[in-house]
A protein has these predicted regions:
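Surface-exposed binding/hinge segments that line
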Residues: 111, 128, 135-137, 141-204
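Long beta-strand-rich cores associated with HINT superfamily self-processing modules
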Residues: 530-556
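Alpha-helical secondary-structure segments
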Residues: 125-134, 177-184, 222-223, 251-253, ...
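Structural transition elements
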Residues: 348-385, 402-407
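Ligand-site clamp/hinge motif
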Residues: 209-215, 234, 242-287, 302
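N-terminal lobe/hinge region of extracytoplasmic solute-binding protein
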Residues: 53-103, 219
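Gly/Pro-rich hinge or "lid" segments in bacterial periplasmic/extracellular proteins
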Residues: 184-249, 253
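Extracytoplasmic/peripheral linker and loop segments enriched in polar/acidic and small residues
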Residues: 173, 339, 423-435, 464-533, ...
Length: 556
């Protein structure tokens, strides 16, 4: 999901796709608005509550609505899906007993384990999943993760403007309380992999009786039980004693302390008023690893950091002028120097649109020279664009000021200004909530920071969910509404491919189209960085480099 949208991290182990299309597969379970300080005392029960950095969720805590990390990290702790992912990106059944594929990966039968229940005591059944998927996929319900279901039969009908909010996916059938039959409109070998993302989490009946109330007080089946959400201050949860899955918490609960500035969170950590943060401010990147007052963590990662120039901006349409200008701007930026000076080498310049942990990642894509610093070429391309339509106005990049983007956005704007001799400036928005509301509603009047951290370990998550037409118009992560039928066709071929190697070839051909159009401009892949107090132990990162909150403990 998006970073801050975007502040998730990934390790650099290569991850291969789970499924070869056409094979029958059974997966068996393998065994606070305030910028001041908070008190470390917790109001929740239990002796080992961990206080962690958080940002105010931009959406209700409805799994299908959440598209950013502020809410995503919370939802991931409160819910459990069909499968989970281990530290290497391996897939393990959680609520699923088996997922069987047939008919060239267009038909799946899912068996659900018995005995799971939500924290309100009601059972988790096949209906819990199917009802949740139908609700999320239906455009009338305005769920940001609708596109995750785009390959299920009947999805297109649910995207019509006059669709009934209760209409369902024709490809979903509840066979019995513990069996789901799924028919797809096209082969989708990534379906079992993405079924562990929070878009696919089950929901109890209470979620549909009063969705607004549920979004404020979610009832889940995950390793933690929701306690409270004090807006712009904290989200509290305690260990769920009835949880039956692979992620049993080693602590008694989590307090997500909501900050509007990672600098404030880091100061609280150093002062002993916060236990753990995964958001190291840019001002501390040069010093945090040598700071004796804390424990520092830094490992190779790969969340993608980009910025998007939406095609509705003047001079930036999906045409020759727009492509020339996006390429010129990209080649104006010295990614390597910014990585050294601002990120202190905790990031590496991007070479494609995905990240090193994913098997389709490549340093050798045709056209990737647009991601290299070349001011002379940038000026030539800008001049060609001016010959089509003379430039006027200013160029801005918006960002959320409560994240870690300020320094690098300002650096990029300086490069663009100095290279192209235009007025370029950064545009801060005070909170993630304000920023994301403008992004989600398509109201941005400038370029804006963007990026991605994985919901599931597949190139599909980076490419289809961000750039496919099915993910545009508020149905997924394609916030710039980029649409290119040629790219869409490559994604369809990748999902239909009989092997990971074959799929990767199509994903890479799709990326070469993106390098021409640049719907977003790739900048860096960042390391997984974090810090804790000396009392905290058990710090670990998942396949995507995100913190494993269930593993955290602290000395009393």
């Amino acid at each position: 999901s998006d970073l801050n949208i975007w502040e998730r991290f990934m390790n650099t182990r290569h991850i291969t796709s789970l499924v070869a299309a056409g094979a029958a597969i059974v997966m068996l379970l393998s065994g606070c608005g305030s910028t001041g300080s908070f008190s470390n005392a917790s109001s929740t029960s239990g002796s080992n509550i961990i206080s962690v950095y958080g940002s105010e969720p931009a959406h209700p805590l409805f799994p299908g609505a959440v598209t950013e990390a502020g809410g995503g990290k919370v939802v991931d702790q409160l819910f459990a899906g069909l499968v989970t992912y281990d530290a290497k990106g391996g897939i393990h059944n959680e609520v699923a007993d088996s997922i069987t594929s047939s008919d060239n990966a267009t038909h799946y039968v899912i068996k659900i384990k018995k005995g799971w229940k939500f924290t309100d005591g009601t059972p988790v059944t096949a209906h819990s999943f199917v009802d949740a998927w139908n609700y999320t996929a239906n455009s009338a319900n305005k769920q940001g993760s609708a596109s995750f279901f785009s390959t299920i039969q009947g999805y297109d009908d649910l995207q019509k403007s006059d669709v009934d909010p209760s209409a369902t996916l024709s490809g979903l059938k509840v066979v019995d309380d513990y069996t789901i039959d799924v028919k797809l409109s096209q082969p989708d070998s990534a379906f079992p992999v993405k079924s562990g993302s929070h878009a696919y989490m089950p929901l109890p009946e209470s979620a549909f009786k009063d969705p607004k109330k549920f979004g404020e007080n979610p009832v889940g089946n995950g390793p933690y039980k929701f306690v409270s959400w004090s807006h712009n201050r904290s989200i509290k949860m305690v260990k769920n004693p009835d949880y039956k899955g692979n992620r049993v918490a080693k602590n008694d609960g989590l307090d997500f302390m909501i900050y509007t500035s990672p600098d404030s969170a880091y100061a609280d950590l150093r002062g002993g008023n916060l236990d753990f943060t995964h958001a190291i401010p840019s001002t501390a990147l040069k010093t945090f690893q040598s700071d004796k007052s804390i424990k520092a963590y830094n490992q190779p990662g790969g969340n993608t950091l980009t910025f998007t120039i939406p095609e509705w901006l003047e001079h930036f349409g999906q045409d020759e002028e727009g492509n020339l200008r996006r390429q010129a701007i990209s080649m104006s930026i010295d990614r390597k120097t910014i990585a050294e000076k601002i990120f202190n080498n905790t990031s590496t310049p991007a070479v494609d649109f995905i990240a090193a942990p994913i098997s389709a990642y490549s340093k050798n894509l045709k056209g990737n020279e647009v991601l290299k610093y070349n001011p002379k070429k940038a000026k030539e391309l800008w001049a060609k664009a001016n010959a089509i339509s003379p430039w006027s106005g200013e160029f801005g990049i918006a960002y959320n000021a409560d994240g870690t983007a300020k320094n690098w956005v300002e650096a990029i704007c300086n490069y663009i200004k100095n290279t192209l001799d235009i007025d370029a400036k950064s545009i801060p928005m005070s909170t993630s909530d304000e920023f994301l509301s403008n992004v989600d509603s398509g109201k941005m009047t400038s370029a804006y920071r963007s990026g991605w951290g994985p919901d599931y370990p597949s190139a599909d998550n980076y490419l289809v969910q961000l750039y496919d037409s099915s993910s545009a118009d508020g149905k997924g992560g394609n916030s710039g509404n980029y649409k290119n039928p040629e790219f869409d066709a490559m994604m369809d071929k990748a999902l239909s491919a009989p092997s990971t190697e074959e799929a990767d070839k199509y994903y890479q051909q799709g990326e070469e189209i993106l390098l021409q159009d640049l719907p977003a401009i790739p900048l860096w892949n960042q390391n997984a960085t974090a810090a804790s107090t000396s009392a905290v132990s058990g710090v670990a990162f998942d396949y995507g480099g995100g913190p494993v909150f269930t593993a955290l403990t602290k000395k009393q």
